[in-house]
Amino acid sequence: MSGNTLGTLFTVTTFGESHGPAIGCVIDGCPPGLALNEADIQLELDRRKPGTSRHVTQRQEEDKVEILSGVFEGQTTGAPIALLIRNTDQRSKDYGNIADTFRPGHADYTYWQKYGIRDYRGGGRSSARLTAPTVAAGAVAKKWLREKFGTEIRGYMAALGEIDVPFVDWAHVRENPFFVPNQQIVPQLEAYMDALRKEGDSIGARINVVASGVPVGLGEPLFDRLDADIAHAMMGINAVKGVEIGAGFASVAQRGSVHGDELTPEGFVGNHAGGVLGGISTGQDITVSIAIKPTSSIRTPRRSIDKAGQPAVVETFGRHDPCVGIRATPIAESMLALVLIDHALRHRAQCGDVSVSTPKIAASAP
């Protein structure tokens, strides 16, 4: 299994399985001198950890991070940063009934066909449990970007199943377990999830992420375009089936006179491009939307096959998120942060001394 590393200069390699003794990551390429401690990382992990409400998996993991290397006297040294998170609440017996069968919609079948061996306990390496190290690494990236450029990366749930969530205020996002920017809709979402759980089914979600204060010039055309790497990273999140940058698929119905964001001396007029033109950041907000499929581990009986290719009926009885999208907001934020820090370092390496006479215009015209 060779696809475990993200990035070019700022790289993150994750390791571990859902029911193994621990999970974690190694960050290489982090600039030295960044003030960093475990509390900085724990703040982000606590936003993602399981068992925080009745609407997510009831697996009780504290997700306490340990910094094993790369930090001395409270500062990064430039050496690899190893982060460890111990698993403490595995319940592998719940998965005995799927040891020889494949859950519809899950990676069980493809992992078995590719590797000829499969850790069926909690999904093994394919589990969303492995997003915790990504969030830990993202916390480091967020801190560096904030201190270097003033970049802020924020996300929210924009839709739960067929329920669209009107945006009201960023302040609401941290006040509810759904990460929605609209407190008034929370009771409706809770009732929806309660009914879904009783039915033994699951549902998908849409998450929006916005990065503000991103400097102009990040991105490496042609094949390492900023938006291409963002899409690549977002598709690396478990259960993500679609990514939009800016207007995304709505661009199909827009005319060029509408979609093209006009430039004035006072700033850009509109941001249909989502902060990226020609694969390079414009200095505007980078806007990303991801679609997350319904969780495949459900109590509803489903048709499948066993390892011998014989018909089987699969029911899953473990502790699972009925909507993995509920905890996906900090994960998507972290992925965006990891791409941005990597491209910031790449830009500095090649184009740090480039200057032009044209002034940088504002992200939006007044």
From Swiss-Prot:
This is Chorismate synthase. Belongs to the chorismate synthase family. NCBIfam families: aroC, PRK05382.1. It comes from Paraburkholderia xenovorans (strain LB400). Keywords: Amino-acid biosynthesis, Aromatic amino acid biosynthesis, FAD, Flavoprotein, FMN, Lyase, NADP. Pathway: Metabolic intermediate biosynthesis; chorismate biosynthesis; chorismate from D-erythrose 4-phosphate and phosphoenolpyruvate: step 7/7. This reaction introduces a second double bond into the aromatic ring system. The gene is aroC. The lineage of its organism: Bacteria, Pseudomonadati, Pseudomonadota, Betaproteobacteria, Burkholderiales. GO terms for cellular component: cytosol. The keyword Ribonucleoprotein does not apply. Its EC number is 4.2.3.5. It comes from the Bacteria.
